[in-house]
Regions:
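The Walker A/P-loop phosphate-binding site
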Residues: 488-508
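A glycine- and charged-residue-rich anion-binding loop/surface
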Residues: 1-490
Length: 508
């Protein structure tokens, strides 16, 4: 069963069970500056889980594009991904444990055809705060799960909370038995031996935690998440997500192009290219800050591993074409934004190639200087960064491949001192946003909104504001543009809007 079939089955199944199908939120959160990317299906729905009414009702389902960046360095093994898709269904004060579990069991066994004996589940074991979740366990037994396939764990494994305080509750997780040999007589889902693979998690938000402890919520919610890539891999009997149709065409092409064989490098190139394309398609652009730096890091790590495979970097355009052709049915925006994706990624490649060559050469010189130690100083890492623009994470990866450690603590101290020195020298010049508030700066601030609107008309929706700085002396407006722009047309649009004399309202 292909990934798109699994996705469609999921959405259709929950639609039949009264759920409204809602669109995936963008990878770049629109109104949540606390996170770089959308990391889970529930993230865009937090206001509704807290009680706000959703326009589509109390039963929702969707597929959500997600990016998680904490495991970038692990990509290259047989399971880690930066970009992934999460299938989810939610009850906002509607059904609860019994119906949620019954639907999950039905979908797994009837829609996907997974044999009952292949499934194991875990439930909350209970503690001094909250009781053992017998309701969930009994619901699984009623559905058809074998009693000796039900396990109980504590808060570390079967409890969910968003932060220190807030809505929380027990969860129940579903595991697929791969058929691999048990690691011991006590082998169970909590093992990390690979026999059991988690496939779905249903969170039951029935409590609220504050400084006084736990209290029952008036509105009980259900939040579930099923990883599409992992489920596709298991249903196809594959060992890794890279063996499925989601990656097969790009992996095959990389194998044809490579002059040095490395399955790890092929996986890194394939995964980081897909992730970068998804981020760019949703409006992300490389930079030295926040999500822009994550994107830059993904593209540059991909390029370094193309070099390791001795693949001509001019092939990058072809690799993008292969990915678009393979994924366009699942993600039509990739085809729509193909030229923008190419432009952004290829431009970043050109910027990095010289840095990579110089940085690797200087790194090797520093390694050759070491005699009785296998540790590279933080000073060297900082020198490569400060003098040659060589990213510290690339130095770290090179050192690891060469059997060396690096003193990251020393590097971080030097980097922090460098930041403080730079900040002190440019605090006034580069202060962001509205630095002062009077008639002049308010006029400039209004002008930024007019300019932003005009740019979107001239350039298109791919014109994204990246910052602004407003003082009584000047206005600075930062934005990115994927092609040459027409200054004259932008000014005409701004002046036309100004001439309308639209009344302005000050919101304080």
């Amino acid at each position: 069963m292909k990934a798109i079939e699994i996705r469609n089955k999921y959405l259709e199944f929950f639609k039949r069970h009264g759920h409204a199908v809602i669109p995936s939120a963008p990878l770049i959160p629109e109104n949540d500056p606390s996170v770089l990317f959308t990391t889970a299906g529930m993230q865009p729905l937090v206001p509704y889980l807290l009680g706000e009414k959703h326009p589509e009702g109390t039963r929702l389902t969707d597929y959500q594009k997600c990016v998680r960046t904490n495991d970038i360095d692990e990509v290259g093994d047989n399971r880690h991904l930066t970009y992934f898709e999460m299938l989810g269904n939610w009850s906002l004060g509607d059904y609860f444990k019994e119906e949620s579990i019954a639907m999950s069991f039905e979908f797994l066994t009837k829609e996907l055809g997974i044999p009952v004996e292949k499934l194991s589940v875990t439930c909350f074991a209970g503690d001094e705060d909250c009781p053992r979740d017998e309701i969930a366990a009994n619901a699984w037994k009623k559905a058809g799960i074998l009693e000796n396939h039900i396990y109980y764990y504590g808060k570390d494994d079967n409890w969910w909370i968003a932060g220190e305080e807030g809505p929380c509750g027990p969860d129940t997780e579903m595991f697929y038995d791969t058929g691999k040999p048990a690691c011991s007589d006590d082998c169970q889902p909590s093992c990390d031996c690979g026999k059991y693979v988690e496939i779905w998690n249903n969170v039951f938000m029935e409590y609220f935690k504050d400084k006084n402890g736990y209290s029952k919520l008036k509105q009980k919610n259900v939040d579930t998440g099923l990883g599409l890539e992992r489920m596709t891999m298991l249903l196809q009997g594959k060992e890794t997500p890279f063996d499925t149709e989601l990656f097969a065409p790009i992996m095959k092409k990389l194998e044809q192009l490579q002059k040095i064989d490395s399955i790890e490098s092929r996986r890194i190139v394939a995964e980081h290219l897909r992730s970068s394309m998804m981020i760019v398609s949703d409006g992300g652009r490389p930079s030295n800050l926040d999500r822009g730096y994550v994107l830059r890091r993904l593209i540059r790590r991909m390029i370094r591993h193309m070099n390791k495979l001795q693949i001509n970097l001019d092939e990058l355009s072809t690799l993008i074409d292969i990915n678009v052709d393979n994924l366009k049915e699942m993600y039509p925006d990739l085809a729509k934004n193909k030229e923008i994706i190419k432009s952004v990624i290829l431009e970043e490649k050109e910027k990095f190639v010289k840095t990579l060559v110089n940085g690797e050469r200087e790194f090797q010189k520093e390694i050759n200087k070491l005699k009785d130690t296998k540790k590279l100083s933080g000073k060297v890492v900082f020198k490569l960064y400060d003098t040659y623009g060589f990213p510290p994470e690339v130095t770290k990866e090179l050192a690891k491949e060469s059997g060396y450690e690096i003193d990251m603590k020393e590097f971080e101290e030097l980097f922090k001192a460098h930041q403080e020195k730079s900040r002190a020298g440019s605090e006034q010049k580069f202060k962001g946003g509205l630095a002062e508030q009077n008639e002049i700066t308010i006029a400039y601030h209004t002008a930024t909104h007019l300019l932003n609107a005009a740019l979107k008309q001239v350039i298109g929706e791919n014109a994204h504001q990246r910052g602004s700085n407003i003082t009584v002396d000047r206005m600075r407006f930062d934005f990115n543009c994927d092609h040459k722009m027409t200054t004259k047309k932008t000014l005409i649009l701004m002046r036309a809007r100004t001439a309308e004399s639209t009344p302005l309202t000050a919101i304080t």
